[in-house]
Amino acid sequence: MGDKKRVLVIFGGQSSEHEVSRISATSILKNINLDKFDVSMIGITKDGKWLYYDGPIDKIPSGEWEEIALKDGTRSIADRVSLFDNIISCKNNACGLEKASENEKSKKIDVVFPVLHGCNGEDGTIQGLFELAGIPYVGCGVLASAVGMDKIYAKIIFEKAGIPQADYLYFTRKEIYGDVEGVVDKIEEKFSYPVFVKPSNAGSSVGVSKAHDKNELKEALIYAARYDRKVLIEEFINGREVECAVLGNDDPVASTVGEIIPGNEFYDYKAKYIENTSKIKIPADLPEETVEQIRNYAVKAFKALDCSGLARVDFFVHKETGKVYINEINTMPGFTSISMYPMLWEESGISYPELIEKLIDLAVQRYNDNLKEYDE
């Protein structure tokens, strides 16, 4: 067997999905094939410090990893890790991972797996850093990550691509805080209750509310504006919530379709990660033509945003008409034990370790495809 690929797994981050990231990363670290990959880990604390971690994997979900990382040696958090000087070299193609000590040599890496959800993780920011440094990385590029994270602009792209979706409006935080009554009036002119209110840039249903009347709508608008400066309002679709996984670069393929059966009124953050009351059905009990339509729309959305590597695309299937509506796309879906993305591929014939290997290979493939040759 040849040399192992050196993979850097990054977890944590400063978003509201920090805890989900830690759980996703732990799941990946437990399933990655160590016969093929040499794995290093970096955790990003909630206050944005990057820490090299080589301790037990099972200390990551609880957050204990941070204390262990800080106790490693006598270095303080200030000199333990420095992003630009000591962790990732921004000299193009340097691909360097260094520990903050004069006595330790740089550890080279081949691929980064950024298991980061939410802002500053899957919104194109960290992807831009990897592009600048010339390091292959798992997942979508800067453009697809940024657009996929912004629900409003993703909807604009889906509309242009001809993919059916719920009707919508959007407002800025300034508009909401400045005249919430006026914003409510505009929403009521267009939609009847209930409506969904969402921060434009947030994942895992963070900041999302279902408003049934004027008072709930006001509260929902102010609540969503806490999480982002843009707020999306969508008409209510009385639909079943289904999801489809996509894998690939230029020739992506779609998985089977799974259904979320929410334990709450809708599949919010609590239902996903805290109460564990929702149920998952894979494959979804849907007519074959509906499944194929969902799979086709998933690939169409993936291509419309110029995604690469992976994405999970969420849909509604109207309970009465059977019409399919795209809800949103997630360019770094969860990898927890209850996450749809790996489960959908497992049902489709790709095991978790195989899936991780394919994602790493796709990252290298895209990196090589993007290399530009210039005439001297």
From Swiss-Prot:
Q: List ligand-binding residues for ATP.
A: 188-243
Q: What domain of life is recorded for the organism?
A: Bacteria
**Where is the major localization of this protein?**
cytoplasm
Free-text remark on how the cofactor is bound: Binds 2 magnesium or manganese ions per subunit.
List of residues binding Mg(2+) 1 = 314, 328
Q: What does this protein do?
A: Cell wall formation.
Tell me a GO biological process for this protein. Answer: cell wall organization
For this record, an example GO cellular component is:
cytosol
* Source organism per UniProt: Acetivibrio thermocellus (strain ATCC 27405 / DSM 1237 / JCM 9322 / NBRC 103400 / NCIMB 10682 / NRRL B-4536 / VPI 7372)
List each copy of the ATP-grasp domain by range: 155-361
Q: Which InterPro entries match?
A: ATP-grasp (IPR011761), ATP_grasp_subdomain_1 (IPR013815), D-Ala_lig_Van_CS (IPR000291), D_ala_D_ala (IPR005905), Dala_Dala_lig_C (IPR011095), Dala_Dala_lig_N (IPR011127), PreATP-grasp_dom_sf (IPR016185)
GO molecular-function annotation terms?
A: ATP binding; D-alanine-D-alanine ligase activity; metal ion binding
Q: What is this protein called?
A: D-alanine--D-alanine ligase
Q: Where in the cell is it found?
A: Cytoplasm
Which reaction equation describes what this protein catalyses?
2 D-alanine + ATP = D-alanyl-D-alanine + ADP + phosphate + H(+)
Q: Which HAMAP family match?
A: Dala_Dala_lig
Can you tell me which residues bind Mg(2+) 2?
328, 330
